[in-house]
Amino acid sequence: MNPYVLMILISSLGLGTTLTFASSHWLLAWMGLEINTLAILRLMAQQHHPRAVEATTKYFLTQATAAAMILFAATTNAWATGEWDINNLTHPLASSLTMMALALKVGLAPMHFWMPEVLQGLDLTMGLILSTWQKLAPFALITQMAPNTNPMLLTTLGLLSTLIGGWGGLNQTQLRKILAYSSIAHMGWMIIILQYTPQLTLIALGLYIFMTSAAFLSLKMASATKMNTLTAAWSKSPVLVSTTALTLLSLGGLPPLTGFMPKWLILQELTKQDLPATATIMALAALLSLYFYLRLSYAMALTIYPNTTNALTPWRTNTTQSTLALALMMIGALGLLPLTPTIMALFF
């Protein structure tokens, strides 16, 4: 791609997200979301592969549907109350419809069906952008809307997302689909605690970005897109495979890794809010996610091909990929649990 075109598209991605962050008017927030969507579509289709084009088309249709729902809901609220302010979305129909549209944008269950299919058709770099950056703008609107939204709707979205995110990943062999279901489950954890403690949602979102970025960058460096390719990765780069396995276990919430922190804090807060049944369901759903992460780690570490190679292993050669970003993300994904009191002090 022409570097000037690439610069314009990346700038548009940043502009759209920033515009949505800074907006208090629904029309400006909607414009930011659409600028963001139009910029990412060209980046998604740059491979000129049928699967990439199909994924781009599916993404466009879902995002266009969500955008139409948001515009309709905002107009309905303005007609009923005379308010375009995001924090004054008080009409019940408009509030519920907007929340469902934003849930469709970020891939919350039961509006999640597009996400595994779209992520499967993209390369790992675009999958990383779709799983992290593209969720920031809609999630900012969800955070602002949460006080005026029906609590039962948020709880239902959260529970369904964690359960479906866990069940959906059990029978998958494609790594991108597994990470898509992981994203759905993590979004469920964030959305269910949003109505009680928004600060915990922000902590969970930040740690999710660290862990997901580390996972995508590790798999990209290992050139792995299927589970069976992980079995041959150990002989090529043992250090990379070891850290990748730990990152995946961190995504699953296994202590003493970073991913345990948000789940522990959220379960603790749900218990304080007298919701033991909800906390129990969330904990059981976390076990489902942890199972398929353990399966991936098993495939990487304990199923090594019984052969030797005479070729020079890649870790002895000069790599052409920068490992600085991966190293920083790995530190965040693996070692932040001891800093829990410090992080809590910063947000509370």
From Swiss-Prot:
GO molecular function, one term: NADH dehydrogenase (ubiquinone) activity
Gene: MT-ND2
Pfam families: NADH_dehy_S2_C, Proton_antipo_M
General function of this protein: Core subunit of the mitochondrial membrane respiratory chain NADH dehydrogenase (Complex I) that is believed to belong to the minimal assembly required for catalysis. Complex I functions in the transfer of electrons from NADH to the respiratory chain. The immediate electron acceptor for the enzyme is believed to be ubiquinone.
Family the UniProt entry places it in: Belongs to the complex I subunit 2 family.
This protein's name: NADH-ubiquinone oxidoreductase chain 2
Enzyme type, top EC level: translocase
GO biological process: mitochondrial electron transport, NADH to ubiquinone
Localisation: Mitochondrion inner membrane
TM spans (from-to): 3-23, 25-45, 60-80, 99-119, 122-142, 150-170, 178-196, 200-219, 246-266, 274-294, 328-348
GO cellular component: mitochondrial inner membrane
Keywords annotated in UniProt: Electron transport, Membrane, Mitochondrion, Mitochondrion inner membrane, NAD, Respiratory chain, Translocase, Transmembrane, Transmembrane helix, Transport, Ubiquinone
Lineage: Eukaryota, Metazoa, Chordata, Craniata, Vertebrata
Stretches of the chain forming a coiled coil according to its record: none
Topology of this chain in the membrane: Multi-pass membrane protein
Known catalytic reactions: a ubiquinone + NADH + 5 H(+)(in) = a ubiquinol + NAD(+) + 4 H(+)(out)
EC numbers for this chain: 7.1.1.2
InterPro entries: Complex_I_Subunit_2, NADH_DH_su2_C, NADH_UbQ_OxRdtase_chain2, ND/Mrp_TM
Domain of life: Eukaryota
